[in-house]
């Protein structure tokens, strides 16, 4: 569930971890006030969809109007970097160990899943945000939606 040493994660594997984390995180409105992931995932998906066409349009527009190539390329590269920044942030967040307050909440949610008869793999090392995302996704699928009220 968690990586033994969070600093040993390869730079490029953070992008894959970010994609996996974005797919795993439950996009529930009730989690939005506590976690920033809902907004970051939504904006990253938006950037993945719309920034490549914006970059191409900006580049073509500048070239067609006889503008300089340097600023046009810089603007296009900036537009293309926005989705990558979101995925990188999500990847870093996924391997970040949980702070103590969220850690207690994580174990309470796991306890509720076990009380409901769900088999859970034991937690290895200190849980990270990816483990929280996996647990929350499973809790929203398996438990009643009111499980957050009791926590």
From Swiss-Prot:
Pfam families in alphabetical order: DUF412
Transmembrane recorded as keyword: yes
Cystine crosslinks: none
Subcellular localization(s) per the UniProt record: Cell inner membrane
One GO CC annotation: plasma membrane
Keyword field: Cell inner membrane, Cell membrane, Membrane, Transmembrane, Transmembrane helix
Domain of life: Bacteria
Protein name: UPF0208 membrane protein YfbV
Phylogenetic placement of the source organism: Bacteria, Pseudomonadati, Pseudomonadota, Gammaproteobacteria, Enterobacterales
Gene of this entry: yfbV
């Amino acid at each position: 569930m968690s990586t033994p040493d969070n600093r040993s994660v390869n730079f490029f594997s953070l992008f894959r971890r970010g994609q996996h984390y974005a797919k795993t995180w439950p996009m529930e409105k009730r989690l939005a006030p506590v976690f920033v992931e809902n907004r970051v995932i939504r904006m990253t998906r938006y950037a993945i969809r719309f920034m490549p066409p914006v970059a191409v349009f900006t580049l073509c527009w500048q070239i067609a109007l006889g503008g300089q190539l340097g600023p046009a390329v810089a603007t296009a590269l900036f537009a293309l970097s926005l989705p990558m920044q979101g995925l990188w942030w999500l990847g870093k967040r996924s391997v970040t160990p949980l702070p103590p307050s969220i850690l207690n909440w994580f174990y309470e949610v796991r306890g509720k899943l076990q009380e409901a008869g769900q088999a859970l793999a034991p937690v290895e090392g200190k849980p990270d945000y990816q483990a929280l995302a996996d647990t929350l996704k499973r809790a929203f699928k398996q438990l009643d939606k009111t499980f957050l009220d009791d926590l």
